[in-house]
A protein has these predicted regions:
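Membrane-embedded alpha-helical hairpins and interfacial helices in multi-pass inner-membrane proteins
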Residues: 73, 77-78, 97-165
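Hydrophobic alpha-helical transmembrane segments
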Residues: 6-11, 42, 46, 54-61, ...
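Alpha-helical transmembrane segments in multi-pass membrane proteins
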Residues: 12-19, 48, 59, 63, ...
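Hydrophobic transmembrane alpha-helices
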Residues: 1-46
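Transmembrane-helix signature of multi-pass solute transporters
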Residues: 43, 66, 70, 116-119
Length: 165
């Protein structure tokens, strides 16, 4: 990466970490263990659309590892990596298909994130019974993906003429 690109990547990483921390401070209880709004994923969506696939992957992994060490634990990193990587893969594929807006891509990512975490939970606790959470997690992923997608759509509209590269 060149100087400007590194600086912009650093800003997005810092914002993602700030959003991760802010999310810890928001006392929202969805009644689902580990469920969060996914505010930091807003930065991943923005980087995917403004900087590219490699940069978005680097941001996602960097944010997950750093926020895991700063605010969580090793299991949290494991769950977040599973969800984050599956979410990233789904968002890249949906974005490349060109038939969904950023909102649809974000909904797909939010849903995939929860599925990835559920799959890891099944392996960790060695039972498929945690799969009973799937319907609730799918709805939660759709709702949070929708919210993040709507914010991303608005931000992208406002920074449309700004070159980040």
């Amino acid at each position: 990466m060149h100087g400007k690109k590194v600086a912009i990547f650093g800003v997005f990483t810092a914002l993602a970490l700030i959003f991760s921390y802010v999310e810890l401070l928001i006392p929202i209880n969805f009644g689902i263990p580990g469920a969060k709004l996914g505010l930091a994923n807003l930065m991943t969506v923005l980087v995917l659309y403004k900087m590219g696939t490699k940069e978005a992957l680097a941001l996602s992994v960097t944010r997950i590892i750093l926020s895991g060490f700063m605010f969580g634990n090793l299991f949290g990193i494991l769950y977040s990596l599973a969800g984050g990587l599956l979410s990233f893969l789904v968002m890249v594929l949906l974005k490349r298909s060109d038939w969904l807006s950023v909102v649809g891509v974000s909904i797909g990512g939010g849903t995939a994130h929860n599925i990835g975490q559920l799959l890891v939970a099944m392996v960790v606790v060695q039972t498929y019974q945690v799969g009973y959470y799937l319907p609730v997690l799918l709805v939660a992923g759709e709702v949070t993906g929708l919210l993040i997608g709507l914010v991303a759509k608005e931000v992208l509209k406002r920074i449309q003429g700004i070159s980040l590269l």
